[in-house]
């Protein structure tokens, strides 16, 4: 009886050992890396060590994980203060490649619908559209928008690397204090591998995994204006008009006249009239104003 149970027990032990073998993990491993694995069973029979039994599994290639983050440089929920009539006002963003392959990233910005609310801890409601908006990539790494920043897509962004991106818009001159324009930035993953050449947007590989090919897996999270696993991530921000709220009043009164120069002067022919111009910036205004000139024009 025992002679039949011993091989069975040995086989069961071997199965248990194989079942407990750890799986090869590919988290953080570069796309296209070849992974192989060998199982070795060391055993003895009757106290005598036997030749190890070795099994080699088929190798496989690590797939491409596509993911990224897009965050306003001022933090989630942040907005940028602007003044009415200003041009090339900038919202800086940070785009990070959280995937496992060098990628290009296509960039786009959009004005959000009127009535859109955004902001934290203070929430603002969109009531106008910024104009002439464009997206530009920081060219020299100084995190400031310069005339040399003309690239409109991110070229060859390595895994775990980040790049500063600017959404630049003009603010209409008619806007008043506390007006708000909500915008977003969307980054779409594209194929890399060719410097200074814009790649095509990546699409997920369909069907079962083939061990000897590299599949594309869209692993991005849902952004503010897109879905999860769609190869893109978006994030919102906006322009908040912060300007002076000036009022001007003009009063007139008799200063002196040739009949009664110093006693209750009247505005008779030959009299002098005094105009008083008063300027005020509202106590609730968001910023101060610099007085350049006051024109007093007779009509």
Where are these regions (language model features)?
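Bacterial N-terminal signal peptides that target proteins for export
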Residues: 1-11
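Exported/extracytosolic protein signature
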Residues: 2-4, 22-299
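Bacterial N-terminal signal peptides
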Residues: 11-19
């Amino acid at each position: 009886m025992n002679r039949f149970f011993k091989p069975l027990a040995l086989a069961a032990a071997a199965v248990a050992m194989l079942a407990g073998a750890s799986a090869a993990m590919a988290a953080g491993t570069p796309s296209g890396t070849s992974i192989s694995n060998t199982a070795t069973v060391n055993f003895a029979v009757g106290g005598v060590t036997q030749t190890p039994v070795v099994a080699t599994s088929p190798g496989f290639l690590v797939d491409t994980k596509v993911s990224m983050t897009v965050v306003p440089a001022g933090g989630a929920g942040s907005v940028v203060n602007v003044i009415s009539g200003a041009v090339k006002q900038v919202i800086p963003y940070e785009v990070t490649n959280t995937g496992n392959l060098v990628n290009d990233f296509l960039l786009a910005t959009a004005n959000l619908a009127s009535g859109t609310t955004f902001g934290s801890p203070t929430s603002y409601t969109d009531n106008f559209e910024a104009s002439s908006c464009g997206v530009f990539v920081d060219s020299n790494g100084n995190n400031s928008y310069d005339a040399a920043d003309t690239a409109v897509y991110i070229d060859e962004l390595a895994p775990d690397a980040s790049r500063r991106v600017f959404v630049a818009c003009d603010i209409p001159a008619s806007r008043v204090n506390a007006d708000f324009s909500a915008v977003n930035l969307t980054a779409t993953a594209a194929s890399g591998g060719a410097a200074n050449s814009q790649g095509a947007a990546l699409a997920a590989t369909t069907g079962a995994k083939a061990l000897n090919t590299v599949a594309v897996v869209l692993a991005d999270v849902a952004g503010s204006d897109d879905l999860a696993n769609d190869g893109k991530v978006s994030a919102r921000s906006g322009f908040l008009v912060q300007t002076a709220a000036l009022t001007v009043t003009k009063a007139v009164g008799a200063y002196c006249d040739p009949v009664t120069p110093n006693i209750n002067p009247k505005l008779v022919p030959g009299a002098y009239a005094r105009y008083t111009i008063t300027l005020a910036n509202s106590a609730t205004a968001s910023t101060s104003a610099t007085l350049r000139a006051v024109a007093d024009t007779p009509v």
